[in-house]
A protein has these predicted regions:
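Conserved redox-cofactor binding core of oxidoreductases
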Residues: 2-15, 114, 135-195
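N-terminal glycine-rich phosphate/pyrophosphate-binding loop and immediately adjacent elements
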Residues: 5-128, 133-134, 139-140
């Protein structure tokens, strides 16, 4: 049992009756039925699953990685990378120029990344409109949905002063005339310990 004063959402969910099947422990095929099956439990999958379940649909989420609880986090990067990230945090872009820290655990990248939260940028929405026929995906049409999720996920301005490297980045951006501000984060009870 954890001695942390911060509640463990995984343990709370299991206590409420979450049905979890660890595929790594199965020794026979199983048949499951649902109205909707969602592949991936990251930001998009998790929010979609909750929205659909609240509307009365039965939902199954299929996740490649394991379910980890607060008690499973030992604050050791050597253990975290192989157990929580795709390709042990070695995934890269095709040209190998950029590392991609993509989660491979329940919660996906929302479990392992820094909780930065921002609305889909207008140029991205415009790209989706032009290339995927999503004409209704405008900032105005999505604003109430963004607001609903921001409230649900406790998204707010990060009030902790930036560390020196981020402050230097902010000052440099200001000198170049580039707008810069503290990023919005989805946190509740964060102690800013660096983990």
């Amino acid at each position: 049992m954890s001695t942390s004063p911060i509640p463990d959402p995984i343990q709370a969910g299991l206590a409420r009756g979450w049905k979890v099947i660890d595929g790594a422990t199965l020794d026979a095929s199983r048949t499951l039925e649902a109205d909707v099956i969602i592949i991936g439990s990251g930001a998009g999958g998790g929010v979609t699953a909750e929205t659909l379940a609240k509307s009365g649909l039965s939902v199954i989420i299929v996740e490649e990685g394991a379910l980890k609880s607060s008690k499973d986090f030992k604050m050791r990067e050597a253990e975290a990378y192989p157990s929580l990230y795709q390709e042990s945090a070695a995934r890269k872009t095709k040209d190998k120029a950029i590392n991609i820290l993509q989660g491979r655990t329940v919660g996906g990248s929302t479990t392992v990344n820094w909780t930065s939260s921002f609305r889909t940028p207008t140029p991205t929405l415009q790209y989706w409109q032009q290339h995927f026929g999503l004409a209704g995906y405008t900032p105005e049409a999505l604003a109430p949905w963004f607001l609903m999720m921001e409230q649900r996920l406790n998204v707010s301005t990060w009030l902790t002063p930036p560390n020196e490297n981020n402050d230097l980045l902010k000052r440099g951006a200001a000198r170049l005339g580039i707008p810069a501000a503290a990023i919005m984060r989805n946190v509740k009870g964060c102690w800013n310990l660096g983990y």
